């Protein structure tokens, strides 16, 4: 029986880590947002600000994580990340004031999630794959979609049956009990295994080795990163506020949380399908197609008046953002792959997570000011169209 290429074990580990990290910290947030607004009597802008603070921290720390991976290794960074993330969730059970929410969620939890999140996992997969890289990235990022299906429903069920404090404690347990052993045992580099990545060995390929300074001087880096930032900005407006938007229309809270799960479920074929397309055609056009689906989704959201329409929106934007997730690191790796990829991907993360900082607070501010989400959702369409234009202007990688 042929031995399984170890890179696929790394893909599996990345899948599980992203399931835990993205599902608990990001996709369960809209469920907690509604509860915090009701029980704490906080404004939606106040609660959404925690996600903005977290996005800023993740963007800033992402560059440091990429540098640390290059300096001290992948596994130490990821183990520390899992433990810190679990601590952040455990502390969230004790909050009584907004500043505590910002400290525990926005700072501590976000630092930990960055350690086991996309910078680390995408860097790990990139180390093992050259040919078929987008497919491998797509499979790994399916974990984000599955986590987005499971964790909001789990959080909603725990809150309904017990309370939000219990839900936060369970999130902490998941990150520590699952994230720590996977990070310590599975997430190894080719150097640690003393092997040459299979695809590079078979084809005699050698990825480029651009430094972060060289990458920052390239127009392609900024066009790709800013395009992703705009896409995530628009996406975060809808995702953060869609549960509250639905509840305002009279939709049951658990059913509204299910729409978040549906979004993530439809992101799975988006990740797999667009990931595969990224290996056989120009990734720029694949990324543009994914963003176009997001724009159409916002048109549907503006017309939504019932649960069925909300589900159609969730399906469309799920496929779109699912397609973006593996294509972004794949496109960056085509331009800047090599030993410094972690730092370069972290630097790109600093740019594109600006969108995740702005979107939640912008959506909350629009609602608190106008008592409607209409202008926020219209902005999502316009911003996504700008993202499509920028990626169209990005140059083609020299390797293609």
Summary of predicted features, one role per range:
Residues 235, 255, 261-267, 273, ...:
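C-terminal transmembrane helical hairpin of 12-TM major facilitator-type secondary transporters
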Residues 61-73, 271-282:
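Helix-to-loop junctions at the C-terminal end of transmembrane segments
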Residues 25-33, 216-272:
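Extracytoplasmic gate region of multi-pass secondary transporters
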Residues 140, 144-191:
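Helix-loop-helix hairpin linking two adjacent transmembrane segments in secondary transporters
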Residues 106-142, 337:
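Cytoplasmic helix-loop-helix junction between adjacent transmembrane helices
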Residues 83-96, 293-305:
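C-terminal ends and interior cores of transmembrane alpha-helices
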Residues 9-35, 40-44, 65, 238-243:
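Extracytoplasmic
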Residues 19, 100-115, 229, 309-322:
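Hydrophobic core of transmembrane alpha-helices in multi-pass small-molecule transporters
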